[in-house]
Every structure is written in C-alpha cells, then in structure tokens.
Amino acid sequence: GHVPCGKDGRKCGYHADCCNCCLSGICKPSTSWTGCSTSTVQLTR
C-alpha cells in the first residue's frame, strides 16, 4: 500500500522513499536521517 507523505502529498511505497514524514513535513530519502523514524509508522511495500 502507498500513503501520502510530506507537504506535497507524494505517495511513498517504501520507508526509504519518504521516511515517515519528518517534523518539518518534508519527505527525506533516508530513514537514517536525524528526525526520521521507522518505528512510528510502518509503511508497507
């Protein structure tokens, strides 16, 4: 499944695509970046 994420509402299919919507609401390319979490919301492939 895909979920809308970030200010632009981009659809993301993987954690790595868009993190989990960081505090600023901006999609980031890596879940390892500061401010991003993979445990809060589990996106499905």
Curated annotation (Swiss-Prot):
Disulfide pairings: 5-19, 12-22, 18-27, 21-36
Chief place where the protein resides: secreted
InterPro entries xrefs: Conotoxin-I_CS (IPR013141), Toxin_19 (IPR012624)
Subcellular location(s) of the protein: Secreted
Assigned GO CC terms: extracellular region
Superkingdom classification of source: Eukaryota
GO MF term list: sodium channel regulator activity; toxin activity
UniProt note on tissues of expression: Expressed by the venom duct.
Entries under Gene3D superfamilies matching the protein: 4.10.40.80
Residues bearing the modification D-leucine: 43
UniProt keywords, alphabetically: D-amino acid, Disulfide bond, Ion channel impairing toxin, Neurotoxin, Secreted, Toxin, Voltage-gated sodium channel impairing toxin
Family designation: Belongs to the conotoxin I1 superfamily.
Protein task: Iota-conotoxins bind to voltage-gated sodium channels (Nav) and act as agonists by shifting the voltage-dependence of activation to more hyperpolarized levels. Produces general excitatory symptoms.
UniProt remark on domains: The cysteine framework is XI (C-C-CC-CC-C-C).
Descriptive protein name: Iota-conotoxin-like R11.10
Organism: Conus radiatus
